[in-house]
Amino acid sequence: LRVEKQAVSADGTALVRAGQEIEYTLRVVNVGSSTLRNAVVSDPMLGLQDAAVKPSTLAPGQSGELSVKHTLTQEEIDSLSVYNQASGTATPPRTDTPLEPGTAEVITGLSPPSSLLVAKRHEPLDPERASAAGDTITYYVDVTNNGTRTLVDVTVADPLIDDARHQVGDGT
């Protein structure tokens, strides 16, 4: 018995954000010389425990399969991959004892973009008078994460500002 597993984006696009779906196809292949019955797969991440493949009775060389979707979490996006393992078994003729489980694993690489948008602005100066040396100019630097990965320890450096104070927003 051989277990195979394949993962593809359910909508055919790159896997880049939480909420997208991966479609897993789990396949059990009879590589022996006897017909096997009750072919099932188990995959804890996908919530499968002894789920029957179709067909569940497999002649030599025949395979049965089952497809299941998994919705990506933000944690998976941030880790850049999803590791998943499945097992499968079937029962040979003239016994009620299933074969030792075969296993298959797949690591799905994710490609979320990391991107920051930085915008710098200042408070308007008094339009009634000319600017002079020593005037205080208040600058604002807005940093927005417009990618799909969670970013941590983001810092802003500006060589023109020597005593900058910062206020952290909501982190999104």
Descriptions of predicted regions:
Residues 1-172:
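Exported/extracytosolic protein signature
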